[in-house]
Regions:
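Domain-exit/linker segments immediately C-terminal to small folded modules
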Residues: 178-200, 204
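Conserved phosphate-interacting/catalytic interface
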Residues: 1-171, 200, 204
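Short cysteine-rich clusters marking metal-coordination/redox-active sites
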Residues: 173-176
Length: 205
């Protein structure tokens, strides 16, 4: 019964698949396969299904994939010889892995690995007043990487390694049957009180 209800919700886009959560994106780093020009494309208030690491992103060496804070995706220029922060290194590592499924991500990887392009991105983000805590992502050839079905397919497989690596905290989802890390807290349900009030109102003649 629960599985049938869940599948119905997925088909009707009433819920998100395991490993995804709705997020807004403040800005996109817009890149092209044809040249090294950089521009910033502002996002909006639309909630997009984004890969979500859950509580693992709160640790020291992991972060969310594809959509993260500017301070992680494009950190301040490191001092000479300094290694990138662990979270920034992990973000780049996941992009490399995902680029095997979605080749357009290779453009993003190259940009983050090229100091001149990274500095141009940093300057454009500053010009557009994108703050360190704002969530950002990528567009390549005008295509939002957040909406790439290839990346979503990659993420569904990639995320399984974290459940396997931490078997002590992994539990089976009652609906999907997949191993998952249980949420320590849940997102508040919006609009429920209003709906209940509306339902409980007496019928007026």
């Amino acid at each position: 019964m629960l599985k049938a209800l869940y599948d119905y919700g997925l088909r009707r886009q009433l819920t998100l698949p395991p490993g995804f959560i709705g997020k807004t994106v403040k800005a996109y780093i817009s890149l092209s396969e044809n040249d090294d020009r950089v521009s910033i494309y502002l996002g909006d208030d639309e909630l997009l299904p984004c890969p979500d690491m859950g509580s693992l992103a709160q640790g020291r060496d992991k972060c969310n994939v594809l959509v993260e804070k500017r301070s992680i995706v494009i950190p301040d220029a490191p001092a000479d010889g300094a290694k990138p922060a662990a979270k920034s290194a992990f973000f780049l590592e996941t992009l490399r892995d995902a680029s095997e499924e979605e080749p357009l991500l290779k453009v993003c990887v190259r940009a983050l690995e090229t100091p001149e392009i990274t500095e141009a991105i940093r300057a454009e983000l500053d010009r557009m007043k994108i703050k360190p805590g704002d969530r950002i992502s990528f567009r390549v050839n005008g295509n939002s990487m957040v909406e790439s079905e290839k990346i979503r397919r990659w993420w569904r497989e990639y995320r399984k390694r974290f459940a396997k690596g931490d078997a002590s905290s992994a539990k089976l989802c009652l609906i999907t049957g997949e191993p998952t890390a249980p949420m320590m807290t849940t997102i508040p349900i919006q609009g429920l009180l209003l709906s209940l009030i509306h339902i409980s109102e007496p019928t007026r003649p």
